[in-house]
Amino acid sequence: MGIRIIIAGYRGKMGSTALSMAQNEEDFEVVALLDPNAKEKEFQGIPVYNLKEDLKTIDAEVWVDFTHPEVAFENTHFAIEQGFAPVVGTTGFTSKEIENLIQLSSDKNIGGLIAPNFAIGALLLMEFAERAAKYFPNVEIIELHHDQKKDAPSGTALKTAEVISKERQEITQGHPDEVESLPGARGANYQGMHIHSVRLPGLVAHQEVLFGGPGEGLTLRHDSYDRQSFMQGVKIGIREVVKRNQLVYGLEKLL
């Protein structure tokens, strides 16, 4: 018997990709699916539920969540309370919510993962950006996603800004007296760094980190052209959280 998995949001693009992946792994067993709008009672032989409360009696080890920002915290809290180790790709968590979930998981002795990005290339981009920030404190982030993404900026962009801030000398990027003739033209501001969000049909998930210095520039870019790019990270998350006793934020903490 493999690792028993519940997938929340199985009808979405990421959830359906995760379901296909899990069905092709010998050590994974999908035991339940959750979607509040699903009309079918089972899908490909797997029981389907509309209410998470109905999953309390399910014998499962891992809760995979690709739902929506407005329900992600509640779902993850529920999963930990029920003893399901969460692997969450849904973004939009606040810092306080993450702290709350880490504490709850520690109290319950349950592993878990909230990952802004499951692509290995995106993790490397963040690592390289952190190293570069020591030498290039002038930096801006541009993240580009499909036009159905509900939160902005992306969790990956926020995580990138967080890791950069560990090494970066905090400065205000741009002219101190600059004026926006059109409000929002300079994007969001995170500790003096500007973050810009692009939403267009045809995109999947992309990010650029632009560094500037006297007479030179450095651009780091990662592109996910297909949602398959995230599945290696999801596999790692599922296999690792069952060995842990506390939730972590960021896939890199399980590598």
From Swiss-Prot:
Enzyme class per UniProt: oxidoreductase
Keyword NADP part of the UniProt annotation: yes
Lineage: Bacteria, Bacillati, Bacillota, Bacilli, Lactobacillales
Amino-acid biosynthesis in keyword set: yes
Superkingdom of the organism of origin: Bacteria
UniProt keyword annotations, A-Z: Amino-acid biosynthesis, Cytoplasm, Diaminopimelate biosynthesis, Lysine biosynthesis, NAD, NADP, Oxidoreductase
Positions with a binding annotation for (S)-2,3,4,5-tetrahydrodipicolinate: 146, 155-156
Biological processes annotated in GO: diaminopimelate biosynthetic process; lysine biosynthetic process via diaminopimelate
Annotated catalysed reactions: (S)-2,3,4,5-tetrahydrodipicolinate + NAD(+) + H2O = (2S,4S)-4-hydroxy-2,3,4,5-tetrahydrodipicolinate + NADH + H(+); (S)-2,3,4,5-tetrahydrodipicolinate + NADP(+) + H2O = (2S,4S)-4-hydroxy-2,3,4,5-tetrahydrodipicolinate + NADPH + H(+)
Subcellular compartments: Cytoplasm
One GO CC term, this protein: cytosol
Pfam families recorded: DapB_C, DapB_N
Single annotated GO MF: oxidoreductase activity, acting on CH or CH2 groups, NAD or NADP as acceptor
The protein's role, per its UniProt record: Catalyzes the conversion of 4-hydroxy-tetrahydrodipicolinate (HTPA) to tetrahydrodipicolinate.
HAMAP family the UniProt entry points to: DapB
Ligand binding (NAD(+)): 9-14, 89-91, 115-118
Gene it is expressed from: dapB
Matches recorded under InterPro entries: DapB_C (IPR022663), DapB_N (IPR000846), DapB_N_CS (IPR022664), DHDPR_bac (IPR023940), NAD(P)-bd_dom_sf (IPR036291)
Pathway note: Amino-acid biosynthesis; L-lysine biosynthesis via DAP pathway; (S)-tetrahydrodipicolinate from L-aspartate: step 4/4
Species: Streptococcus uberis (strain ATCC BAA-854 / 0140J)
NCBIfam families in the record: dapB
Subcellular location, principal: cytoplasm
Assigned EC number: 1.17.1.8
Name the record gives this protein: 4-hydroxy-tetrahydrodipicolinate reductase
